[in-house]
Amino acid sequence: MTKMVINPNRKLSRINRQIYGHFSEHLGRCIYEGIYVGENSPIENVNGMRTDVVEALKEIRVPVLRWPGGCFADEYHWMDGIGPVGSRKKMINTNWGGVLEDNSFGTHEYFELCRQLGCQTYINGNLGSGTVREMSEWIEYMTFDGISPMSELRGKNGQQAPWKVDYFGIGNENWGCGGNMNPDYYANEYRRYQSFVRDYNNEHHIQKICCGAPHEDYEWTKEVLATCFRRTSEEQHGFMDGLSFHYYVYPEGIEIKGSSTEFDENVWYKTLNKAVYIDELIRRHGKIMDEYDPLKKIGMIVDEWGTWYTCEPGTNPGFLYQQNTMRDALVAGITLNIFNKHSDRVKMANLAQIVNVLQAVLLTEGDKMIKTPTYHVFDIYKEHQDSNLVESSIETEMIGVEEEWKVPNLTESVSETADGTLHLTITNLSVDQSFDIDTTIIDRSVKTVKGEIVTEEIHAKNTFEEPECVTVKKYDGTQITEKGIRFTIPACSVLHLEVR
């Protein structure tokens, strides 16, 4: 019998709802077809946004949406995406498939989408190929509530009132597609550009996100922070509110990657091992951040994460379209548990990407839409949003095929909502073994337990022909005990228990 202990008396940190955020880039069929079809489309829409997609995303309480990139952000010139749709300047999307971008989805459309979703805004600015003036004028266009050239232009384009920009990224992946910069050079450019990202509304601070490292690039983290903190006061905390971090799970490596649907048990465990590895990366990058920011005023912003496979056969390789199986559900559950556990430092995360790209929560084909296994994990984890992380631990054992890629059999996180309800989310990484778990809940008498679970065999997926092969199912296998609860978690599953 596996032992688990929960201590609700020890509240460790608040789990920001933004940890459950998403990412939408002008890439493949994410924006166009996936989200935006235009007002004249036969597909049901409101102001051009697909009704089915918006309603599905509202169900999982999308808290924040990043846009327009990604690598696209550092080639995006915002003025090309405003004004009458038919007269907007076109461009070639050189990063993603070399296709024509008509800019019919721009600033106004993005804010309309966020309005429909009821989510916060996270805009990534163009440092790589844009100017300081261009970035400054975009902020003025979006947020200035007064008479100015940019606010008047906004009004001319149909939006009199300013919008709220909650987060603004100063460049993206500037160590790579955003300019191939060295860390000290980028950091100095960051300091310059962010100076002109002004808070025109004193009651609403725009949180500035500095471009952080990919994977194990600890040198980037160290040098960017050193340069940003040089000759500054403690109150300025490096001129930033957040430092981004990107991590993708490539099962077979960055070159080959591997199939999204055809894999054996060893590749299953290899993939999950790489998902678990993000815990070490957060700890090590976080330790460097602690040297400069011991009070944790700067959030770690994991604004790109997820699985990355070889594209589906017959699709444009620049569109990054991939299927989604129970393997992705486990990656999502594992990763979100880790983010919860590090919520003292991790303040936002954005799954890549929201529709039709990489580890998407939704896939579309014409007027059809399906929810992926990853979607259902976000659905059963949504009660963690803005709850308090409480102290918890569970006994684990290492499982797998090859020694190098073994993983802990279980991961977990526990939060408490304002009304005292405990929410346990647990993943079972085993292909074929269930585990009995005896849980002690300190100083708490359990009255009721509700459960829901996402579980199927490891290759299970939803398709347009069979859209509900993987869904959320009711789980009623919990027994209330004198000290807490006892339950069995099936193989290859993600479980949520609501304990009152």
Regions found by a protein language model. Give the residues of each.
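Active-site His/acidic residue clusters
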Residues: 249-270, 315
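Histidine-centered active-site/metal-ligand motif
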Residues: 246
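Non-catalytic accessory regions flanking glycosidase/transglycosidase catalytic cores in CAZymes
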Residues: 1-242, 278-311, 315-500
